[in-house]
Amino acid sequence: MEPNPGNRVSSLGAATLIGLCLLATLALPARAEPIRVSADLTPAAAAAPLRISGGAVHLTLEEAIALALDQNLSLRVVRYDQARARENVAQALGIYDFLVQGGLQLSSDTVPAASNLDGAEVQESDRAGFQLGLSRLLPTGGTAEVNWVNGRFKTNSRFSILNPSYSSGLNLVLNQPLLRDSGREATERGIVIARNNREISRLAFVQRVTDLLREVEEGYWNLVEARYQLQVSEAALDLARRLHEQNRVRVDVGTLAPLELVQSEVGIATREEEIIRARFAVGNAEDRLRQLLGLDRDAQLWAAEIVPESEAEISAPLLPVEKAIDRALDSRPELASRRTTRRNLEIEAAWRRNQLLPRVDLQATYKLNGVGGDVLVRSPDGSVIASAPGGWDDALQQVADLDYRGWTVGIGFSYPLGNRSARAQQASAELAVEQASTQEQELELSIATEVRMAVRAVEAAAKAI
């Protein structure tokens, strides 16, 4: 007595339908509405708690996806990459931070006279200096500085007119590259690359979300299929046992040879082995789904049976193959990431070409000077006969009134003869751009092939139901 053929047809149809669901996760958009996923390290909304009833975890596909997006550890790792990429942009923008510099110096000297013009047999002098400066990189590649310099000098020389004397000065300094490292593109190369890397990190997050959705759906339907295969195996075992009992009755009445009992016993053993394998597959599918959902290593959660509640439903592809390929090429994050990487390499190649130019820098300085102090009136022998008080405020007033000015303009030039290092780096950068372009074309072809094969598989599976 053979098992009912209708059961086989039903089993084949159900298994094909589940397989069709798995293929659809690769070929077709899984849902009409976009899924919104937070990229923050601490997502604002948590997934709904697990529904545990009768010692089993009851789970729909939507609940599984929500849990995975909220708790999956690999997705959390990618969130850290995004946070680091944002900080890297802030670090790159730091090139435009103002730099404050300052200093204070005190000194005292005692020097024996080397000439009558020293004004004392032992010349004694005390100095004090204070500087404060502010500098910043310019988008053009140059640097601008403002320096405020102050000093105090006191000596025992009889030739000094201002004693103590105070000096103050305001210096405006500009250093501007004219060829190499000139321009916004060269200056902000690191900023643009950091922003592109942030976009690459975002695309990696999108890619991981996409992969996770596919993995969860595959894991969910694999569990559904494994549980169904277990049910089929159990039904087959029950049928084999009933067949064995029927054969036993027929042997007892003499209408069947005893050898048939041995064959039916072998059938029972085979079905029992299939059940062992089916239960093994169910356990593996449950553990894989638990891992994707990021469940805590709680013994109760990992021991509880997972009962999937969603039913397998699928519709035929709505898009023609060529439109599906075009949509994939426009939306696949790995391709967008590859294109952004190529743009980074193009920026690097442009900067390397700039490094082939000579170093020509324009240096310009504009100064405002002032001096003040006690004015001493001396007799012919150098002794002080009168004095007029003065101080640092006199020097500051002269600077503010623009009384004493000065300026300097110059050009600096440097160029390594041969420039082999820069030429080799530029050639390597150009090759990297060409390589990235080829890899991009390869990925486009791979995506198009993958979509065609996936759509064909879905259509074939749909016809097989």
Label every model-predicted segment.
Residues 1-11:
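N-terminal secretory signal peptides that target proteins for export/translocation
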Residues 3, 92, 202-324, 457-464:
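Periplasmic alpha-helical coiled-coil/stalk elements that build and connect Gram-negative outer-membrane
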Residues 14-27:
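Bacterial N-terminal signal peptides
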Residues 43-67:
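Regulatory alphaC helix of protein kinase catalytic domains
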Residues 50-56, 104-172, 307-317, 350, ...:
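Small/polar, glycine/serine/threonine/aspartate-rich low-complexity segments that form flexible
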Residues 67-76, 83-98, 131-164, 172-190, ...:
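A glycine-/polar-enriched beta->alpha junction
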Residues 68, 179, 256, 260-265, ...:
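Amphipathic alpha-helical coiled-coil scaffold segments and their short linker/junction regions
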Residues 77-92, 208-232, 242, 249, ...:
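Amphipathic alpha-helical coiled-coil segments
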